[in-house]
Design a protein with these regions (language model features):
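Glycine-rich phosphate-binding loop signature in dinucleotide/nucleotide-binding domains
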Residues: 152-153, 250-253
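Mid-to-C-terminal catalytic subdomains of enzymes
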Residues: 254-282, 290-377
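ATP-dependent adenylate-handling ligase core
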Residues: 189-247, 272-282, 302-306, 326-333
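Short, contiguous acidic/charged loop-to-helix segments that flank catalytic cores in large enzymes
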Residues: 129-133, 161, 187-189, 234-237, ...
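Short glycine/serine/threonine/alanine-rich loop segments
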Residues: 155, 206, 231, 255, ...
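Cysteine-centered catalytic environments shared across enzyme families
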Residues: 1-228, 348
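RNase H-like polynucleotidyl transferase catalytic core
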Residues: 183-186, 210-212, 283-284, 356-361
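Generic recognition of stable, solvent-exposed alpha-helical segments in well-folded globular domains
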Residues: 133, 137, 141, 165, ...
Length: 377
């Protein structure tokens, strides 16, 4: 099973046997004494960062699987013919053992018999306060989230950078904590994202790298993207191609990168939301956040893991999510401006052109959509 997903952990692997269970683990970086502590607890973990993990622990009562609150880390399980419970971070790792493959839902725990939820996103009472106070607290929580993940990465870290509000936020907040921040952008020649990413990289003085993608390179990468993505969903595949290629470039420089996923879901970043009644906004944002594990987070995990790196999703830190859900809806969608409170929170830390940039779909900003549409026709 480990051979099928060896790319997820190029730095090493181990087999843990305890309490009648055999568990394998691969890792992306040399392990510290903390890994020995996990082994002593009969525990293996696929960890993206604090609060983002999939975990399996063998006890005298059996094997328990736990997935993080929003499903940043993937986790699948199944029963073999002899009723042995098997699990893995990707479906392909399990297919020789069983075709009974199921997903542990985000925020759930499974003991081999019962699936039990330990976390649900819920509507929260809106906080009261001035725009300035709420923006300041949001910036503080985002900054704390990023700083913790920089520390976990040993201060050797990069950021995927599209030049959009969310990826620029991650890069700007990471920059003060490292001597050198590597940033990576991908797109077809003259793609809008490349221009905006260059501007942002210059603004924060990052070590910037570009991947200029040709149509033939996209077609060559497509089978690999589908293999790692484990999906034929057209929208998911289309948005994953440049993500996969930029992740490949980043893996030559850093073991971990920041990604801006979660910002649109928490702060009302999608165009269709503008036509909704404001009172319906909290439920809609919770719904699309709950679906991230099978959309953007699947893209981010598979793209980074395919090249042995970790993608940190700072917007989905539990402290950030908790606060974002309490921000009043009219501060997220304000006078027709999406993510308004996030723009206020990052005022002064980003160029005005980035602060004012409207949302573009991932594949459109990278220039991929038109070429793939022409090919399909």
């Amino acid at each position: 099973m480990l051979d099928e997903i060896a790319y997820r952990g190029p730095a090493g692997r181990a087999i843990v046997e305890a309490n009648g269970a055999t568990m394998g683990v691969v890792w992306t970086e040399p392990q510290s004494d903390s890994f020995s502590d996990l082994i002593a607890e009969s525990l293996v973990r696929d960890a993206g960062a604090e609060g983002h993990l999939a975990e399996a622990q063998a006890t005298s009562e059996g094997l328990t699987l736990v997935r993080d609150q929003l499903g940043r880390a993937p986790l699948y399980y199944g029963q073999m013919d002899d009723d042995t419970l098997c699990f893995a971070s990707e479906v392909k790792a399990m297919l020789e053992a069983t075709h009974d493959v199921n997903e542990v839902p985000p925020g759930h725990r499974y003991d081999g018999k019962k699936m039990k939820a330990y976390f649900h996103l819920k509507k929260k009472r809106p906080i009261k306060g001035s725009t300035e106070d709420i923006a300041h607290e949001l910036q503080r929580r985002l900054a704390d989230s990023v700083e913790r993940r920089v520390s976990e990465s040993g201060k050797l870290v990069g950021s995927w950078l599209s030049g959009g509000l969310e990826s620029s936020t991650m890069a700007a907040l990471a920059r003060p904590h490292v001597d050198k921040l590597y940033t990576f952008a991908a797109g077809t020649p003259n793609a809008p994202d490349l221009e905006h990413a260059r501007e942002m990289a210059e603004f924060i003085d990052s070590d910037h790298h570009e991947v200029i993608v040709t149509f033939n390179e996209m077609m060559d990468a497509l089978p690999e993207v589908i293999y790692h993505l484990e999906s034929f969903d057209a929208l998911l595949v289309r948005s994953s191609i440049t993500n996969y290629l930029v992740a490949k470039a980043a893996s030559d420089y850093v073991p971990a990168v920041f990604s801006g996923e979660g910002g649109d879901e928490l702060f009302a970043g999608y165009e269709y939301i503008k036509s909704m009644d404001i009172e319906d906004l909290p439920d809609e944002l919770i719904d699309i956040t709950n679906r991230l594990h099978n959309t953007a987070l699947q893209r981010v995990d598979r793209s980074s893991a395919a090249h042995g790196t970790i993608a940190h999703v700072g917007f989905l830190d539990p402290d950030v999510v908790d606060y974002a859900l309490r921000i009043p809806s009219d501060m997220k969608l304000h006078d027709g401006v999406e993510k308004w409170i996030l723009r206020r929170a990052m005022d002064g830390l980003l160029p005005d052109s980035i602060l004012d940039r409207t949302k573009s779909k991932f594949w459109e900003g990278a220039g991929v959509g038109e070429q793939l549409s022409q090919y399909a026709e």
